Amino acid sequence: MDSASLAVVVWAILLVLWLRRIFGQRSSLPLPPAPPGYPVIGNLLDLANNDVHIRARHWSRNFDDDVISLKVLGKTMIILNSPTAVSDLFDKRASNYSDRPDMPMIVDFIGWDWTFALMRYGPRWKEHRRVFNNHFNIGTSGASEDRHIQLRICRELLSLMFQSPSKYLENLRHYTGHIILKRTYGHTVVDEEDPYIRLVEAASQSTSEAAVPGAFLVDLFPSMKYIPEWFPGAQFKRKAREWRKLSEAMINAPYDMAKGKFDEGNAEACFVSACLEQNKTASGQGLSEELIKDTAAVAYAAGADTSVSTLTTFILAMTLYPDVQKAAQAELDALLGGERLPDFGDKTRLPYVTAILKEVLRWIPVLPMAVPHRAVNADTYKGYYIPAGAFVYGNAWAILHNPDIFADPETFRPDRFIENPTLLNPIDNGVFGFGRRACAGRVMALDTMWIAMASILAVFDISKAVDERGNEITPPVKLSPGTISHPAPFPCIIKPRSKAALELITQDD
């Protein structure tokens, strides 16, 4: 059979499977309201611009409903645009909405089946999350050691910001990556060319691209995973083959390094060495190597990339809103007197700095549409039908940019959290996911971001860059494409606030 005939046969089979999906699930109740689509492809074109979170809010307003739906190649997507809808399904009906859908591109082809963030809800997910919680969550015996690591590496960040302020993004990657690598693998990062930081950056970027809703049809049309790589439309397989190499290297390379040190008897205290030591002294069956390796990679991959994005947003906000920066510095000066750097013991006495962190998370949420949940069984909500297997998204961006909750939501204004202490907290409403699938490492991430923001504000002034004519350059609020909202690169000026601030920056050099 020639390739043209084979193509016709394969696509005919896929069409039959699609028709079975379309007509296989029926209900007397309607789906939630949806924008108009096209025959066969449905709303596929609405996913093309990487702005579904913004469009979904627009549709929600037009329909005067906080729940909307999309149909893409016969697959149903449900988008929840309010904290009430999110709580009703992801919290109150967690048993039906804590699963993840099949994501062939990321899981099957790129090979991210090791991360419990994407695992199906069940015993394997629970085991991986339990091990993570036992070692990384605050309140455990390792909490003070975590903060010691964060403080020490934050001091390094200040030195890097002074030495090369124009390379703030590389400095932030060094900071967040070093904390995770030290805590997880006992690895010391020397400079920005560290191979493990470069590796996680490349691997995370590939996954961010792959996770965009509708970016790869195989996620909406899983039958496509069976077509051969040379077949028309199978370019995704070739791309995934290259990305899989990054995934495998990210899982194995730092683990092999840490295990090698442990076997030689010179391992530093870290997650991997703690697990391996636990296995040596365990009376019964210890943790499998796969479980240790997988859990370490989750911390390595998730912690570094999202925290970098948030801290870059912080730098952007301070560049654009100097009055906010001055207010935070006044709070810090009143407490510290310019004589020392902040530490975690100061947190309760720096409410405005904490408000800045909340506003950064609200203004540009790292995961605007979060990761989709899956309806295990067919369900009804508000008189609408939700079919089994539907992708169910919590639209964090729509929730955190709702003008009925946050006045003037496009403006960066931390004062809103000071003026109204009961205002919806972004930390608990989408920034770290929803329900039982909320990010397990959020406490460590929040500490990493808070101490960096407080320390930078204590000793640096951040302002707009100027062009060759001396005119200020106002950076646009522009995001790079991908699932994770990274601010596009922008120039700014970062310089010590004073001679006393410079002495604090260089005191440990």
From Swiss-Prot:
Transmembrane intervals: 4-24
Record's bilayer topology term: Single-pass membrane protein
Keywords, comma-separated and alphabetical: Glycoprotein, Heme, Iron, Membrane, Metal-binding, Monooxygenase, Oxidoreductase, Transmembrane, Transmembrane helix
Gene Ontology cellular component terms for the protein in this record: membrane
Biotechnology: Melleolide sesquiterpene aryl esters are cytotoxic secondary products with anti-cancer potential. Armillaridin shows therapeutic and radiosensitizing effects on human esophageal cancer cells. Armillaridin induces autophagy-associated cell death in human chronic myelogenous leukemia as well as of hepatocellular carcinoma cells. Armillaridin can also inhibit the differentiation and activation of human macrophages and thus might have potential to be developed as a biological response modifier for inflammatory diseases.
Glycosylation sites: N96, N279
Binding site for heme: C439
Top-level class of the enzyme under EC nomenclature: oxidoreductase
EC number: 1.-.-.-
Function: Cytochrome P450 monooxygenase, part of the gene cluster that mediates the biosynthesis of melleolides, a range of antifungal and phytotoxic polyketide derivatives composed of an orsellinic acid (OA) moiety esterified to various sesquiterpene alcohols. The first step in melleolides biosynthesis is performed by the delta(6)-protoilludene synthase PRO1 which catalyzes the cyclization of farnesyl diphosphate to protoilludene. The orsellinic acid synthase armB produces OA by condensing acetyl-CoA with 3 malonyl-CoA units in a three-round chain elongation reaction folowed by a C2-C7 ring closure.
Family: Belongs to the cytochrome P450 family.
Protein name listed in UniProt: Cytochrome P450 monooxygenase ARMGADRAFT_974139
Species of the source: Armillaria gallica
